């Protein structure tokens, strides 16, 4: 479940030229907005092990006068399974609305007896990450694991050919890692929230980086302007762990990739 929490979200940096007269870049965004909520079932085969959600606050918060999205990602094991392995993971990013880059990041992990609390403040002007574990140099517009996911949703994924690799950078655990995302093609899948046309992508995993090379991760994103995650599949030695979309609300616009709704099946 920890890898699901990491991967669902693990994509992306693409440097765009700064508009004349502007201090920071501007990234067009039709994918998401205030108040969006995405809900998921996390399970193994036919067993539901937990729930997860992405939530954008309905109102902006501000960093140095710049409007920002206040975004949370949470994964929780079912209370009925807490005796076996209790999970309460929470991630937060403060994401610049105009530039789609992070100003702040929090990570609170509770998995069994393991606990970790980490926070970072990104000085995007001076390219530094000031964290609870020290201060580190970063490249321009570096991302955390949550902001990277939202940034990649703004990209025109339909313009990439099958097999193309999007190169990106992500700050994690005291370092900035180079990661790639391979475009695998298109597929139609059915989940609890309906039947969707999707673009399938694969984060390219490197040992010691954001993910461990324990298995393949595949992500299905809706093949429309919203590019919401419909499914995340992680292979493990004994099978596959899946996170599947069960519900959504507050979308920025229509979800044209949905072919059928749950009620029409």
Show which residues each predicted segment covers.
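Bacterial N-terminal signal peptides
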Residues: 6-16
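Hydrophobic, well-structured mid-protein blocks that either form specific transmembrane helices
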Residues: 114-156
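Acidic, serine/threonine-rich low-complexity disordered tracts
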Residues: 21-124, 158-265
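Alpha-helical interaction segments
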Residues: 14-15, 75, 140-141
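Compositionally biased, intrinsically disordered low-complexity regions enriched in proline and serine
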Residues: 8, 142, 151-152, 161, ...
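Selective for proline/serine-rich intrinsically disordered segments
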Residues: 15-17, 137, 260
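Positively charged n-region of N-terminal signal peptides that target proteins for export
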Residues: 1-4
